[in-house]
């Protein structure tokens, strides 16, 4: 019984390999250059104080990448 299941699995994988499944066009893995252009780093973010390394007090609770709010 197990040999029949193994043979069936091999036949299915040969007829329909997993690499033949097309990736979705919206996935970022297909377009790494666009992913890098869309990245907004913290030093370009208007609510981030690059000198002190902290966020504007009104947005401190919204951002996880900044340290405690500057006072």
Swiss-Prot record:
InterPro entries: Conotoxin
Disulfide bonds: 54-70, 55-66, 60-69
Pfam families in the cross-refs: Conotoxin
Expression tissues: Expressed by the venom duct.
Keywords: Disulfide bond, Neurotoxin, Secreted, Signal, Toxin
Primary location group: secreted
Domain statement: The cysteine framework is III (CC-C-C-CC). Classified in the M-2 branch, since 2 residues stand between the fourth and the fifth cysteine residues.
Protein's recorded name: Conotoxin TxMMSK-05
């Amino acid at each position: 019984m197990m040999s029949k299941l193994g043979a069936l699995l091999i036949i299915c994988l040969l007829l329909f390999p997993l690499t033949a499944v097309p990736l979705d066009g919206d996935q970022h893995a297909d377009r790494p250059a666009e992913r890098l252009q869309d990245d907004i780093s913290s030093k370009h973010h208007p609510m981030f104080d690059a000198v002190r390394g902290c966020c504007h007090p009104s947005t401190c609770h919204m951002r996880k990448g900044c340290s405690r709010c500057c006072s």
